[in-house]
Amino acid sequence: MKIGFSDSQKKFREEIRGWLEKNVPKIPLNSFDTQEGFEEHREWEKKLNSGNWSMVTWPKQYGGRGLNLIEWLIFEEEYYRAKAPARVNQNGVFLLGPTLMEYGSDKQKEKFLSAMATGEHIWSQGWSEPGAGSDMAAIRTTAFKKGDKYIINGQKTWSSRAAFADWTFGLFRSNPESERHRGLSLSLIHI
């Protein structure tokens, strides 16, 4: 058994390495915890997308390249070797995007995935709450349907990138009578 990269994988490594050498900013971007830095990182997301590098494993129909796990690992190795900027949209790209691909409606996929891939929509996460921390079963913020809208009542904390994001996703208690690890709904909220 020969263990190593195939010729096409080696060629792929050269391709991403070359693109990164030409495009990674020579001066590090400001922190994305500031307005200026956030906008710089959003522009980087757009640049990645223009080179078709923003979502290497996503299906082509959602703005990706449709690559496999080995190619994704090659991409990640080269990305970090080049000291490329941190991904400001990692909450959307790595957490919400795959969830929508698996469980989202066609309408949700159409509305959110391409905008996520291009950097048009930056996402924050809304998991944690005071008194709940990382214990998702302890969530108390509620979401109840009233007409064609949901009324959300409660508080979230440590919402990564919420200060500058366009959208947030989070877990909310939609059935307070259920067992504590049930009755939760994932909601997408324009902020």
Regions found by a protein language model. Name each.
Residues 1-8:
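Intrinsic disorder at enzyme termini
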Residues 9, 105, 187:
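Residue-level signal for inorganic ion chemistry
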Residues 148-149, 153-189:
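A short core secondary-structure module
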